[in-house]
């Protein structure tokens, strides 16, 4: 198994900052925006975007944590640990995740969102888009496009969970 670091901590920080600037540029009314991180690493990325938005615009946007497990199509989980402290009805919700791959995680996240309310708009921000979609889903904000083969894996590490920030590509062959 071969592992290669393709994004270091500095590059990851820059990608998150770029996503934050794009959110500012594309959303005229930031006061109507809610950030929704997909557990687990998407939540920490959402918090970082929230912090950058505060630094750049002086805004404290609400943030939620989406648990997609009860909404997945390949497993059955009863407990839903979603934390959404704000009513998302009529809001512009930005889903945030670490990697966009087949699109199934995002589909489950959207199912979770609409179970909570009726957002005015839903957009998607991801740190890494690796391709290989199985569903017609695309990201509105992308930190890095990293094409992979179907056997390779993208591993995102964040300091809050893994002790360091980096993105690696793993080839199991």
UniProtKB/Swiss-Prot annotation:
E.C. number(s) listed in UniProt: 2.4.2.9
MF-aspect GO terms: RNA binding; uracil phosphoribosyltransferase activity
Alphabetical UniProt keywords: Glycosyltransferase, RNA-binding, Transcription, Transcription regulation, Transcription termination, Transferase
Group of enzyme by EC: transferase
Range of residues in the leader sequence: none
InterPro entries: PRibTrfase_dom, PRTase-like, PyrR, PyrR_bifunctional
Residues spanned by motif PRPP-binding: 93-105
Domain of life assignment: Bacteria
Gene3D superfamilies referenced in this protein's UniProt entry, alphabetically: 3.40.50.2020
One biological process term in Gene Ontology: DNA-templated transcription termination
One Pfam family this sequence matches: Pribosyltran
Catalytic activity as recorded in UniProt: UMP + diphosphate = 5-phospho-alpha-D-ribose 1-diphosphate + uracil
Recorded family membership: Belongs to the purine/pyrimidine phosphoribosyltransferase family. PyrR subfamily.
HAMAP family: PyrR
The protein's role, per its UniProt record: Regulates transcriptional attenuation of the pyrimidine nucleotide (pyr) operon by binding in a uridine-dependent manner to specific sites on pyr mRNA. This disrupts an antiterminator hairpin in the RNA and favors formation of a downstream transcription terminator, leading to a reduced expression of downstream genes. Also displays a weak uracil phosphoribosyltransferase activity which is not physiologically significant.
Subunit structure, interactors included: Homodimer and homohexamer; in equilibrium.
Name of this chain's protein: Bifunctional protein PyrR
Provenance organism: Streptococcus pyogenes serotype M5 (strain Manfredo)
């Amino acid at each position: 198994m071969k592992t290669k670091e393709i994004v270091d901590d500095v590059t990851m920080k820059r990608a998150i900052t770029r996503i934050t600037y794009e959110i500012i540029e594309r959303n005229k009314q930031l006061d109507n925006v809610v950030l929704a991180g997909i557990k687990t690493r998407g939540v920490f990325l959402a918090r970082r975007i929230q912090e950058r938005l505060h630094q750049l615009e002086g805004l404290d946007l609400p943030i939620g944590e989406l648990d997609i497990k009860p909404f997945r199509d390949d497993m059955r989980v009863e407990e839903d640990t979603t934390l959404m402290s704000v009513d998302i009805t009529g809001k512009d919700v930005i889903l945030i995740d670490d990697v966009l791959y087949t699109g199934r995680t995002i589909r489950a996240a959207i199912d979770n969102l609409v179970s909570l309310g009726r957002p005015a708009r839903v957009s998607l921000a991801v740190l890494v888009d690796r391709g290989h979609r199985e569903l017609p889903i695309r990201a509105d904000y992308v930190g890095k496009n990293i094409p992979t083969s179907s056997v390779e894996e993208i591993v995102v590490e964040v300091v809050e969970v893994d002790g360091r920030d980096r993105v690696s590509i793993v080839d199991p062959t």
